[in-house]
């Protein structure tokens, strides 16, 4: 028998009741089977479509096989590095149902990133897409805790298909509790070292009942499509938590979300809800193949990851007649806690708090700011907050302060009560919605034979979106020029995830520094 949560939406915020024995995967799947949606399509991916019944069987087989075939125990961890498609929800939910903790990770990283995450998490199993296997194959035997490498989309005895074939279609959910560890996501840190962000079973349904139903207005008959991938907290809600919470259908796309790829899915599947990020919205509007008004049937669009430029929002609304509901969420809070909403969209702001979450702004002295127009660090209190960073007590203590979670973002509240983004509290950059450490990019640049010193800052492009810009001091004997710029960009792309490379490189004689030798990035940002 399924153990389901119940939400009463006659109140604001809704009253959410979660039983003492509770498994998030059991809830998200079981509610749809009990509601008679077994024959309804839940996912459409690049290979075909799948019903709720088919998903339930795949999840049971996966949970059963992880526990019995591979011998995983409750709270053991499995790394999930899988391109968007049916294999992601199969593995993610299958692990959760079995009491195993899945760790969804970015599919765009490097071999060294993956080695760090495998070592840090001590995951016993990694499930990876066939396309990513060359990056993971060297890990077997190199990372001592890794026992099994399972290939999604592959063939043979190590494939996910072969593993599922060993599992049972009848599988009872592990007797987990709402506050048991459920899954991890990795969040970047100020030094570039990722942090394992630990979420519990009750977090998923809270995001659906507090944001997706009342703010976004998602409903059973909707088809939804998220350009943000499932390994992001934003994408996980968009393409997995929210559609399953209401019985909707989600479109999944494995390839990179270029304007052309997104246009094709929008035209073919005609989603009711589209989830994007500012960089993509700007690129789509600038593309000559952008759909015309009346070509799509969009009812709602959302944006997160970075602040949506006001001009982009207004141009999108003018073209399609539908607003973009810009908001802010985080890996730590799992999804959006501050948002514009239908009928109350103020472009250039992140809107107002989602009911069920409390926000405060704190100044540099630790005092709460109550005056409009004064910027401070945004802190959040809400039921979907992560409980810790794995194996990182210092940063856990610095971020999770009792009921409050620090965002690292600076905000101000304008005279009308809407929250306006005012930058990062540290030097971290948000590039296409993904945090980038300038220190990591600087280290890669300095590894080039021509570079003596490097400093990286955030710089606005023509759409007012932030991208990395590098200021370079060359070693004696090297000359500045376009050929070297091109070589440096390629060098960074070769060492780091491609989105981290500097879009602009400026050669300078020296870098501004403090008396103690610390680079003064604020002077470069205003240069």
Swiss-Prot record:
GO terms for molecular function: ATP binding; benzoate-CoA ligase activity. Its EC number is 6.2.1.25. Optimum pH is 8.5. One of its GO terms (biological process) is secondary metabolite biosynthetic process. It catalyses: benzoate + ATP + CoA = benzoyl-CoA + AMP + diphosphate. InterPro entries: AMP-bd_C, AMP-bd_C_sf, AMP-dep_synth/lig_dom, Benz_CoA_lig. Induction: By benzoate and 2-aminobenzoate. It comes from the Bacteria. CDD domains: BCL_4HBCL. It is an enzyme of class 6 (ligase). Keywords: ATP-binding, Ligase, Nucleotide-binding. The keyword 4Fe-4S does not apply. Belongs to the ATP-dependent AMP-binding enzyme family. Benzoate-CoA ligase subfamily. Monomer. PANTHER family: ACETYL-COA SYNTHETASE, ANTHRANILATE--COA LIGASE. Catalyzes the ligation of benzoate and CoA to form benzoyl-CoA at the expense of ATP. The enzyme also ligates 2-aminobenzoate and CoA. The enzyme shows activity toward a number of benzoate derivatives. This is Benzoate--CoA ligase. The lineage of its organism: Bacteria, Pseudomonadati, Pseudomonadota, Betaproteobacteria, Rhodocyclales.
């Amino acid at each position: 028998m399924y153990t389901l949560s119940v939400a009463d939406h006659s109140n604001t915020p809704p009253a959410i009741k979660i039983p003492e024995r509770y498994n998030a995967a059991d809830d998200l799947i079981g509610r749809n089977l009990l509601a008679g949606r077994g024959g309804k399509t839940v996912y459409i991916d690049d290979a075909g479509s799948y019903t709720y019944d088919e998903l339930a069987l795949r999840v049971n087989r996966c949970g059963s096989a992880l526990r019995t075939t591979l011998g995983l125990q409750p709270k053991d961890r499995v790394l999930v590095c899988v391109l968007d498609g049916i294999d992601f929800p199969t593995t993610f939910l299958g692990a959760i149902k079995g009491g195993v903790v899945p760790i969804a990770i970015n599919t765009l990283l490097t071999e060294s990133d993956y080695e760090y995450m495998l070592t840090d998490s001590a995951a016993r199993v990694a499930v990876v897409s066939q396309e990513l296997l060359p990056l993971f194959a060297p890990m077997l035997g190199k990372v001592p805790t890794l026992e099994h490498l399972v290939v999604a989309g592959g063939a043979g005895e190590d494939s996910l298909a072969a593993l599922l074939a060993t599992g049972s279609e009848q599988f009872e959910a592990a007797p987990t509790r709402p506050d048991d560890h459920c899954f991890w996501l990795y969040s970047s840190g100020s030094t570039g070292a990722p942090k394992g962000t630990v979420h519990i079973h009750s977090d998923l349904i809270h995001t659906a009942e507090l944001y997706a139903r009342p703010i976004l207005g998602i409903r059973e008959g909707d088809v939804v499509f998220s350009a943000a991938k499932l390994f992001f907290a934003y994408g996980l809600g968009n393409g997995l938590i929210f559609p399953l919470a209401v019985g909707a259908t989600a479109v999944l796309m494995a390839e990179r979300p270029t304007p052309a790829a997104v246009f094709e899915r929008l035209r073919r599947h005609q989603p009711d809800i589209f989830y994007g990020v500012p960089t993509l919205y700007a690129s789509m509007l600038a593309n000559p193949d952008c759909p015309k008004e009346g070509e799509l049937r969009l009812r709602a669009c959302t944006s997160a990851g970075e602040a949506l430029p006001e001009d982009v929002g207004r141009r999108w609304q003018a073209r399609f007649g539908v607003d973009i509901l810009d908001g802010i969420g985080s890996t730590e809070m799992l999804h959006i806690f501050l948002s514009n909403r239908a009928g109350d969209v103020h472009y250039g702001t992140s809107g107002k708090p989602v009911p069920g979450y409390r926000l405060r702004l704190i100044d540099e002295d630790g005092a709460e700011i109550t005056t409009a127009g004064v910027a401070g660090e945004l802190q959040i209190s809400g039921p979907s907050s992560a409980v810790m960073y794995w194996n990182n007590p210092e940063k856990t203590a610095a971020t999770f302060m009792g009921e409050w979670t620090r965002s690292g973002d600076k905000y101000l509240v304008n005279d009308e009560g809407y929250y306006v983004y005012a930058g990062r509290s540290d030097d971290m950059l948000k590039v296409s919605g993904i945090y980038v450490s300038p220190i990591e990019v600087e280290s890669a640049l300095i590894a080039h034979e021509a570079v003596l010193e490097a400093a990286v800052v955030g710089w606005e492009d023509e759409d007012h979106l932030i991208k990395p810009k590098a200021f370079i001091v060359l070693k004696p004997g090297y000359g500045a020029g376009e050929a070297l710029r091109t070589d440096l960009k390629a060098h960074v792309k070769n060492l780091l995830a491609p989105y981290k490379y500097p879009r602009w490189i400026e050669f300078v004689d020296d870098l501004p520094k403090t008396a103690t030798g610390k680079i003064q990035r604020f002077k470069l940002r205003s240069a």
